[in-house]
Each structure stands twice: as C-alpha cells, then as structure tokens.
Regions:
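Bacterial Sec-dependent N-terminal signal peptides
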Residues: 1-25
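Carbohydrate-active catalytic/glycan-binding domains of CAZyme proteins
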Residues: 21-356
Length: 356
C-alpha cells in the first residue's frame, strides 16, 4: 500500500513538474513586457541584418547608476541651462539587440557625449538609419529653450549598429526653432524613392525637412523653405512615419509625458508632406496593466505585413514620471488600411527569428 502511494505521489510530482516546465517554456517563447530591465523611454526599434535593435533614451537609474566618464568645460557650462536636474543623467545612449525578440543583449554607451563635444545633457529619442554602409544616429541634445542656447538635433556616425558613434558634423544639424518647433524628437525617414527626410519637433509643432545626401544639412523645397510644418491636431511630440500600400502614416505622442494619459495618435496622407488629418488614438494606457503608453516606433518585418509597435509605458507601482519601461506589442491594420487600437500586454510578443 505504501509503495502504491509512493508511486502515485511520484507520478503526481512528475505531472506537476511537466506542466510547470511546459508553462515556463510557453512563457519563454514570448518576450514579456518590459522586454529588458531598466528605466528607458522613447525607443527606436529597427532591423539590421536579421537582428532586432532598440535604441532608447536613458530615463533614470535602475540599480547601479550609469554615467558618462566626465565632462568638458563647455559641457559643464552648458549643463547650467537645464530646466530639470534629472536631464543631467541623460548623457549617453545604450542600445539593445536580439535575434528573436525574447533575448536581448545590452550594448552600453553606443553614443556618449565624450564623442559629441557640443552635447551636454538631455540626449533624447535616438533615431537610426543605414546608408552606404554607414550607420547614422540622430539624437536630441541639451533641450534648448530658445535660439540663444547651444544644442538641438545632432547626428553621429559609426561603422556598426553597436557603435561607437562619433559626431558627424561637429555641431547640431538643427539648432534653432523653426515654425515654433523645438528641435527634439527627431525621426529619419527614407521614402520609397530613396529620399531621406528628418521629421521632428516638440512644443506641439512638427516639421519635415529633406536631408542632403551626406546628412550634413538640408535641401530646400521648391518654394525655398527648408522646413515645412506638418503639424496635425493634438500633436505634442514624438513624430514617427511609416508607409504601407501607398499611404503615409504620421504618428505622434499626445498628452503629458509624465502623466497616465500619454498616448499615440495617427493620421494618413498620400504624401510625406501631408496634409495630415488626425484619425484617432492607436496606443494608450490600460489601467489594469500600465499607464503613460507613448513615444513609440514601429518595426516592420521585411516581405510580410507583420508590424510591431515599440513604446514606453509606466508600471502601476510607480507614479514617477521618469520610471518608464520599453515594451513591444503587435500592431494590426483593418481591411481599409486604418490602424487598429493596440492592445498593450504583459506577455509581449511571440519569439520570432528573422529569415535570412
């Protein structure tokens, strides 16, 4: 009798262990949200050579503080302009790479202000592209409040997506307010005809400009203007653009970045220059999961109609505006080409290895 009970108990343990292992394996096949630890924001997601990459803003310390090694006299002087001491921590960019969306490798300080002499703090919202075998990382720096301050949008270059990135032109690419747009939150967009554009802007204004061939400046439009305003209704910051089936989708963030209602909306047009009429929100908080879901990017899997939205959000156990995490969820379109509201999840997305 004791032997039978022992066998029954052992069998039950095996069943429980197998079920637990199967559940763990099932969970391991998904990314989970957040996809990697740390307080990060404004993530740029992209694919290079069958590898997923994410370039976020360093939002706050998570465990051991991460810092740049030191600052020049010019950088220390420029740091006195900051409107928020928290921004003084944001002097570098860390990157993350993955082969399958579930296991991420950290690449520390792919960009650091030691390699950008005019940049001193508020290194924000990186955007990256590859051109002619080089990688170009666009970034905001110094959070300028007026045209008399040093800073704006910069561009750095490297031979590899993991850097190290060094200053490309030795000065900001955009260093002033045009059309009342603060020079932050830049996105480099390659059109189907090969033309590269810079789309950017804070303070509720969004601009677009045509980049020249070597990314050292801009090519004026036919009317001689360098930047055109494409600001849609309710725009705040965080511009992003994709194309799908001949349509241009301008996406942006609305609301206050420190609050629960931070969100993403979008518009559609037949041209990257607009006009863009707001359609509605595509990403926002779920009070049961997380708040402040915003400042996003989009990953499109080549040769498919599969799309992922990469974004930051704030966990429910904190109201600190700087405590943001990078998450990934699926993004879908309806039969008419409109973006369906994204369901934010704790599970994240399924493991996916890119085909060679």
């Amino acid at each position: 009798m004791k032997k039978s009970r022992f066998l029954l108990f052992t069998s039950m343990l095996l069943v429980f262990w197998n079920a637990s292992f199967a559940q763990q394996k099932k969970q391991a096949e998904r990314s989970g949200n957040p996809v990697f630890p740390g307080w990060y924001a404004d993530p740029e997601g992209i694919i290079f050579d069958n590898t997923y990459w994410i370039y976020p803003t360093y939002s706050d310390d998570y465990g051991k503080p991460d810092r740049s090694a030191g600052f020049s006299e010019l950088q220390l002087k420029t740091q006195k302009n900051t409107i928020n001491p928290q921004y003084l921590k944001q002097t570098f960019i860390n990157a993350f790479s993955s082969k399958d969306l579930t296991h991420w490798e950290k690449h520390p300080h792919v960009l650091d202000i030691k390699d950008v002499k005019w940049a001193a703090y508020s290194i924000w919202a990186p955007s990256i592209t590859r051109k002619d075998g080089k990688y170009y990382l666009f970034f905001g720096a110094n959070d300028i409040q007026n045209n008399n301050q040093l800073g704006g949008i910069g561009v750095a270059v490297a031979d590899k997506p993991a850097g190290p990135f060094i200053d490309h032109i030795g000065k900001p690419l955009v260093d002033k307010f045009y059309n009342n747009a603060q020079p932050i939150d830049q996105f480099v967009f390659k059109d189907t005809d090969g033309q590269y554009y810079l789309i950017y802007g804070g303070w509720r204004h969004c601009n677009i400009g045509k980049l020249n061939k070597d990314f050292t400046g801009f090519v004026p439009f036919k009317d001689s203007t360098v930047f055109k305003s494409i600001t849609p209704e309710n725009y705040v910051e965080g511009a992003y653009m994709i194309t799908r089936k001949g349509k241009y989708y301008l996406m942006w963030s609305e609301g206050n970045w420190t609050g629960p209602d931070y969100s993403v909306a979008y518009a559609m047009s037949d041209s990257p220059l607009g006009p863009f009429k707001r359609i509605g929100k595509v990403l926002q908080q779920d009070p049961a999961i997380a708040t402040g879901a915003g400042h996003h990017s989009v990953i499109h899997v080549p040769n498919t109609d599969d799309w992922y939205i990469v974004y930051h959000r704030r966990p429910l156990n904190t109201t600190d505006g700087n405590h943001r995490e990078v998450c990934i969820d699926r993004m879908y379109f309806d039969k008419n080409g409109f973006i369906l509201p994204v369901k934010i999840t704790n599970e994240g997305v399924e493991k996916r290895v890119l085909k060679r």
